[in-house]
């Protein structure tokens, strides 16, 4: 049961003092993100609550005022059509996005450690990819077991010897972190199709509007530079490759970047549409693309258009049914051959999912010393791959307390604690591990920190509670061998009374504020990324070929685009989220244009120095 407290209506006390005095302790053994061990508020939170009172955002922080703000957040999410697909939900899957009212605060000095550690791990991950798909010195030197590499279904043998455009296998990487009394600890890498950047931006757009004065006064670092870096990196690598290697990249008429999505039933489909719109790139599915003469083309109403860069949100094994999973109906036949020919850049390179295996954590300290001559800044959770006899013996002694994790990708399902596996006897687990030890990795449990959150009571009021939390941060390659870490992240909170953090289990998210001593400039994405300003006649159209039946499409041939049309008495199926309304159509003929310039801070566009920018 999460511990909670009510905020009083007494305006004679300072908001910071009220919160610090009356908030109840978090469960024993868990770090309290709100307060220090002596009961006083941590500096970022003391400043946050003080700013609310002084600036008048919420008056004296009455439950009624907070409840009204929370209701406004829920209403804006509903109006924006922000959703998340839950596979286990038999009621249709798509649920409204769950966003906490209170942001998660990170002090400048704490973020500096996270930033350096995340950039280091991204550098290391890219170096590992270059090695296992290249000379494989890590295997010959005994730093990585060959059985772990070759036995992993995420290792793509067809790409052995592949050299990606620009030389980088990874352009984005997400890292999941847990905060304990000892600092921040890495528990997972997300390199296959790292999700969350779009949701983090949507969270920022909403929450910064609820606390506009505090957001400005606390000098929260902005998110758009990370997205500008992403689009710059995607655009730069093919240009470098074409110049240095003599390939046919880029296509004539301008660079064409697409976001490859599995489709509307994917759990993070809203994010795919949101990112495509925000970055000004084409949202496509596998059936929208074709390979001709080792080149990738987009099917449009006006004919085939060359594709230079694919930002994929499609799992590795589904990318190419000719060379990977033959039963894939969402991939692009011939994609790997086009990659090997140097005619298309795919980000991240298929095969990057290997780095997500929990078994790799135990080998990374040695690999970091060998490849980077560095110690890891951010430690990882203690892990034992049972495929090694010595590690298996040590791991089995911790089976009653450890998490049993699948070494390789698996069907949906949560890892379970050894002593809480229900009806299956512990000896059965020992037998299963002994039979196929390489399939299992044991990890030591970590107590998740508890983050403050607003919990409405259903009667127009509520309380401040706390929930177990986990932070995901994002690193973006800068095209020159370095990495930029998005100043913020994707904070996830566990459902009430649970310690497992999972959006599939009904968890929530929180905006993440990285505080700064410097004033952040406010510049639109287009200006930062070097993209041209959006023209007045920008086509507000939607990606249509695979999602909307022909009867729902009004072809605007004179303008080179298509717009969504709902004929009277007819509903398009499957329905499109509202964020699709301005996503570039397959038929749009202007590659690399930014999306329409929206009005107001809700869309993160502002004039420099105006103070209205929310991101």
Model-assigned labels for residue ranges:
Residues 549, 574-578:
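N-terminal helix-forming leader/targeting segments
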């Amino acid at each position: 049961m999460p511990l909670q407290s009510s905020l009083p209506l007494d305006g004679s006390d300072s908001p910071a003092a009220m919160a610090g005095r009356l908030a109840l302790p978090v469960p024993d053994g868990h770090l309290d993100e709100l307060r220090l061990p002596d009961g006083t508020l941590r500096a970022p939170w003391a400043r946050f609550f003080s700013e609310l009172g002084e600036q008048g955002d919420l008056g004296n922080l009455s439950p009624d005022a907070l409840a009204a703000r929370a209701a406004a957040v829920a209403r804006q999410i509903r109006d924006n059509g922000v959703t998340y697909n839950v596979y286990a939900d038999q009621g249709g899957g798509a649920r409204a996005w769950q966003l906490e009212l209170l942001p998660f605060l990170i002090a400048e000095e704490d973020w500096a450690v996270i930033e350096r550690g995340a950039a280091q791990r991204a550098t290391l991950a890219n170096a590992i990819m270059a090695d296992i798909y290249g000379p494989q010195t890590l295997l010959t030197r005994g730093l990585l077991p060959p059985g772990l590499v070759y036995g992993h279904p995420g290792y793509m043998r067809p790409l052995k010897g592949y050299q990606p455009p620009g030389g980088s296998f990874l352009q984005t990487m997400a890292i999941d972190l847990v905060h304990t009394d000892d600092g921040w600890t890495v528990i997972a890498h997300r390199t296959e199709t790292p999700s969350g950047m779009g949701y983090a931006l949507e969270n920022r757009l909403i929450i910064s509007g609820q606390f506009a004065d505090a957001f400005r006064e606390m000098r929260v670092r902005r998110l758009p530079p990370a997205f500008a870096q992403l689009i710059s990196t995607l655009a730069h690598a093919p240009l470098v490759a074409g110049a240095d290697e003599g390939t046919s990249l880029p296509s004539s008429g301008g660079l064409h970047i697409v976001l490859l999505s599995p489709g509307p039933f994917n759990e993070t489909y809203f994010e795919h549409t949101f990112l495509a719109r925000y970055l000004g790139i084409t949202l496509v599915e596998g059936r929208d693309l074709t390979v001709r003469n080792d080149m990738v083309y987009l099917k449009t109403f006006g004919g085939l258009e060359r594709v230079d860069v694919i930002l994929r949100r499609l799992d590795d094994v589904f990318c190419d049914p000719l060379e990977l999973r033959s039963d894939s109906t969402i991939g692009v036949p011939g994609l790997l051959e086009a990659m090997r020919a140097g005619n298309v850049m795919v980000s991240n390179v298929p095969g990057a999912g290997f780095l997500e295996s929990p078994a790799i954590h135990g080998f990374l300290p040695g690999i970091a010393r060998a490849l980077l001559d560095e110690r890891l800044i951010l430690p990882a959770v203690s892990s034992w791959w049972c495929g090694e006899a010595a590690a298996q013996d040590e791991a089995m002694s911790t089976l009653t307390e450890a998490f049993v994790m699948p070494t390789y990708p698996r069907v949906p399902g949560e890892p379970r604690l050894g002593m809480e596996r229900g009806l299956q006897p512990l000896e059965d687990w020992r037998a299963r591990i002994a039979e196929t030890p390489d399939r299992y990795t044991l990890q030591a449990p970590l107590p998740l920190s508890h983050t403050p959150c607003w919990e409405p009571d259903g009667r127009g009021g509520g309380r401040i509670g706390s929930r177990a939390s986990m932070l995901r941060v994002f690193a973006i390659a800068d095209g020159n061998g370095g990495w930029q870490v998005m100043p913020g992240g994707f904070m996830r909170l566990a459902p009430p009374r649970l310690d497992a953090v999972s959006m599939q289990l009904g968890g929530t998210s929180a905006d993440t504020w990285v505080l700064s001593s410097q004033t952040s400039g406010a510049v639109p994405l287009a200006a930062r990324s070097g993209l041209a300003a959006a023209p007045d006649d920008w086509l507000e159209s939607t990606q249509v070929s695979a999602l909307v039946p022909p009867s729902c499409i009004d072809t605007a041939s004179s303008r080179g685009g298509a717009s969504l049309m709902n004929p009277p008495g007819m509903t398009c199926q499957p329905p499109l989220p509202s964020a699709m309304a301005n996503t570039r159509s397959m038929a749009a003929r202007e590659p690399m244009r930014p999306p329409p310039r929206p009005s107001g801070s809700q869309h993160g566009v502002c004039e420099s120095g105006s103070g209205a920018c929310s991101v």
